[in-house]
Every structure is written in structure tokens, then in C-alpha cells.
């Protein structure tokens, strides 16, 4: 372990200790007492973050070696071309050998509207009024007439 790694480990241990010394406030009390505890906890947390910035400033440049390794790895990457789609895409999937068609070329099946949903259109405004009750084809209404039951006292 180099001296720089040792210093970094020391700083990280110190920062971890600082964060452990400020647990989230818990306990009984009125709403204002709990609110004040949370405010004090938040202020202490901000002070810890400011102290952490002073302990470990990230302005130091990283070592040259890892950057060179990362550049070499990026240079070794290649982009492969997608294979041409197979000519037998229109066949049913049971006649094809499983796994021979890459997922990029899977055939999309269009969705069809459900046949049993009478009155449900794309716009909810176009729904017919007979959706709330039984059959309305005979012209009867399910709504109660307010004048009908006025005999109650």
C-alpha cells in the first residue's frame, strides 16, 4: 500500500466516524420538539459535510497509471454490426429452431382491441351511458326518479 492510499484510508475512516456520530433523531415529544431535533440534526450534518470537504479535498488529480489503463481498455473495445434479419421471419415460431433468431429481430405482434368490451373506445368521452347498469336497450333508465318516493316521512 502506498502512502497516498494509506492517507486516503485514514481520511475515509475519519469521515465514517464523523457520520456515525450524528444519527437521525428519534424519540418522543411534541411536533415542535421533533421538528427542532431534525433541524439541529440537519445543521450538524451540514457542518460534518463542510468538515469532510476540508479533510479531503477532491482537487488532487488521480494517478496517471489508472487513466492510461482506462484509455487502453477503451481503445480495445469494438462495435459489432447487427446480423441481417433471417429471411424466414414470417414463419411461425414453432417451425423455427429455438434460439436461432436474435431478440433484435423478433417479430412484433400487433395488439388487437378486446372484442368483449362494447362501448369502450379510445376516448373515455365516447363511452355510452349504458356502462353503469344493466341493459339499456329497452329505453329504461336505472336512475331513480326523485318524485317517485315522496311518501316517506
From Swiss-Prot:
Q: What does this protein do?
A: Escorts unspliced or incompletely spliced viral pre-mRNAs (late transcripts) out of the nucleus of infected cells. These pre-mRNAs carry a recognition sequence called Rev responsive element (RRE) located in the env gene, that is not present in fully spliced viral mRNAs (early transcripts). This function is essential since most viral proteins are translated from unspliced or partially spliced pre-mRNAs which cannot exit the nucleus by the pathway used by fully processed cellular mRNAs.
- GO molecular function terms attached to this record: DNA-binding transcription factor activity; RNA binding
Residue ranges for the region (Disordered) are 18-40, 79-153
Polar residues composition-biased segments: 20-33
Where are the stretches annotated Homomultimerization?
14-22
Q: What is the lineage of its organism?
A: Viruses, Riboviria, Pararnavirae, Artverviricota, Revtraviricetes
Enumerate the InterPro entries for this protein: REV_protein
Q: Which positions does the motif Nuclear export signal and binding to XPO1 occupy?
A: 69-80
What positions carry the motif Nuclear localization signal and RNA-binding (RRE)? 33-47
What is this protein identified as? Protein Rev
Q: Which gene encodes it?
A: rev
Q: Which organism is it from?
A: Human immunodeficiency virus type 2 subtype B (isolate D205)
Tell me one GO biological process term.
mRNA transport
Localization per record? Host nucleus, Host nucleolus; Host cytoplasm
Any GO CC annotation of this UniProt entry: host cell cytoplasm
The record's listing under Gene3D superfamilies reads: 6.10.140.630
One Pfam family from the UniProt entry? REV
Is Nuclease included in the keywords of this UniProt record? no
